[in-house]
From Swiss-Prot:
Residues 1-18 form the signal peptide. It is found in: Secreted. The keyword Signal applies. GO terms for biological process: cellular response to peptide hormone stimulus; negative regulation of calcium ion import; negative regulation of nitric oxide mediated signal transduction; nitric oxide mediated signal transduction; positive regulation of cytosolic calcium ion concentration; positive regulation of epithelial cell proliferation; positive regulation of pancreatic juice secretion; positive regulation of peptide hormone secretion. It holds the Pfam family Kazal_1. The keyword Secreted applies. The record marks R41, I42 as: Reactive bond for trypsin. The record marks Y43, D44 as: Necessary for sperm binding. This is Serine protease inhibitor Kazal-type 1. Residues 26-79 form the Kazal-like domain.
Length: 79
């Protein structure tokens, strides 16, 4: 009887963990072209993983290239 209870509790725990997708810890990797000459002046803000709002994904890529950082997109929109 104890074995059956342990098995059922283990199965329930596994099912509850399997239903939740893992959280994205480091944010979404920005889609950066190989070379960035400049960014279009289109305002489509993104929130970087550093807590700074960038005017666009291109602007975030430009900053990453300029300073050698690897800031990701925490979410679309302002921080």
């Amino acid at each position: 009887m104890k074995v059956a209870i342990i098995f059922l509790l283990s199965a329930l725990a596994l099912l509850s963990l399997a239903g939740n997708p893992p959280a994205e810890v480091n944010g979404k990797t920005p889609n950066c072209p190989k070379q960035i000459m400049g960014c279009p002046r289109i305002y489509d803000p993104v929130c970087g993983t550093n807590g700074i709002t960038y005017p666009s994904e291109c602007s975030l890529c430009f900053e990453n290239r300029k300073f050698g950082t690897s800031i990701h997109i925490q979410r679309r929109g302002t921080c």
